[in-house]
Amino acid sequence: MKQVFLWLIFVLAFHKLLAEKIGDIASVVGVRDNQLIGYGLVIGLNGTGDKSGSKFTMQSISNMLESVNVKISADDIKSKNVAAVMITASLPPFARQGDKIDIHISSIGDAKSIQGGTLVMTPLNAVDGNIYALAQGSITSGNSNNLLSANIINGATIEREVSYDLFHKNAMVLSLKNPNFKNAIQVQNALNKVFNKRIAMALDPKTIQITRPERFSMVEFLAIVQEIPINYSAKNKIIVDEKSGTIVSGVDIIVHPIVVTSQDITLKITKEPLNDSKNVQDLDSMSLDTAHNTLSSNGKNITIAGVMKALQKIGVSAKGIVSILQALKKSGAISAEMEIL
C-alpha cells in the first residue's frame, strides 16, 4: 500500500527573540478595514445566468427596469442572461471619496457561469446600513476555474468616508497580534526608552496604551512608533492540517527522550549512541536504527525536525505521524502548543 507522507514546513522559531518592528507585531486599535456587502445583478451572460425559476432574480430584474421607467411583472420575465450575485469588499482605513477598491462577486442563484458578464451599479453597505461605495464593472474570465465567483480590481468607488480624527488625539492603543506578557513589556520599555519618558504602559498581555509627546503630531508619533525595532518572543507552536498532510513547526522545538507507541508504530527517541551499525543510518547529525525504530541524537538535543525526518524514513503514514505527534504532546515530550486543523 502506497504510503502518504506529510510535507514538513519549518517557519516558526523556538523561543527565539526575533528582530521585528513594532508595526509588524502590533496594530493601532481603531485603524482597521470595514466590511461592505451588496446585492446586485450581473447582466450580459450568454444563456448561463439564473433560470426563470429563480424568483428573486426575476423580481430584481423587474425592480431594476422599473428604476429606469420600464414596468414589467417579474412573472413575465424569461431571461437566462442575468444572474443574482452578492458583492463583498473591504473599506480601508482613511479611504477617501473617489478612491477605488477591489470587490469580490459570488453567484447566489442557479447560474452556470457569471464569466463575461457585467455587474450593474450596486450600492455597498456597511453594518450601520449606510452606503459607502458603488460597485460596477465587467467580469473577465481570467484563469479562474470557478465560474460562479470573480474579482474585479478597482471595481467599486468610495462615496462615503469613515471619519477618524487622528490629528486631535493625544493617546492611542496598540494591540499585539499575538498576546504575550513578555512582548507587551518589551514594547512598553522600547517605547519609553526611545522617547526618554514614560509614554507607554502595558495594560495587559495584548494592549499597550501610548501617549503622544507634545512635540509630535499623532501621525508623526505613530510613524516613529511603527519603525521602532523590538525583540519579539515567538511562541512554540506546531500546526497540523490532517486533510492536506501539512505540518508547520519550528525547526528548534526540542523533543525529550521517550518511547512512544501509536497504532502499529513504536519510536524510541534517545540521546545514547546506537551500537548496531548494520541497521543504523546517518540522518543529518542523528542516527536512525531502522530495524528497531530508534532515533539517537548522539548526545545532542533532538528536535521536531529530526523526529519528522525519522518518521518519514521508516515509512510512517500521514495518519500515523499525526497520532505520534499527539502522543508526544500528551506525554509532555514536547512543550509546544499544538493545533489540529
Curated annotation (Swiss-Prot):
The record's annotation in Pfam families points to: FlgI
Q: State the function annotated in the UniProt record.
A: Assembles around the rod to form the L-ring and probably protects the motor/basal body from shearing forces during rotation.
Q: Where in the cell is it found?
A: Periplasm; Bacterial flagellum basal body
Q: Please give the superkingdom of this protein's source.
A: Bacteria
Q: Which GO terms describe its cellular component?
A: bacterial-type flagellum basal body, distal rod, P ring; outer membrane-bounded periplasmic space
Signal listed as a keyword: yes
Subunit details: The basal body constitutes a major portion of the flagellar organelle and consists of four rings (L,P,S, and M) mounted on a central rod.
Alphabetical keyword list? Bacterial flagellum, Periplasm, Signal
The UniProt entry's sequence similarity note says: Belongs to the FlgI family.
Q: Which residues form the signal peptide?
A: 1-19
Q: Which InterPro entries match?
A: Flag_FlgI (IPR001782)
Q: Which organism is it from?
A: Helicobacter acinonychis (strain Sheeba)
Record's protein name: Flagellar P-ring protein
- Give an example GO biological process: bacterial-type flagellum-dependent cell motility
Gene Ontology terms for molecular function: structural molecule activity
Asked whether the keyword Transferase is assigned, the reply is: no
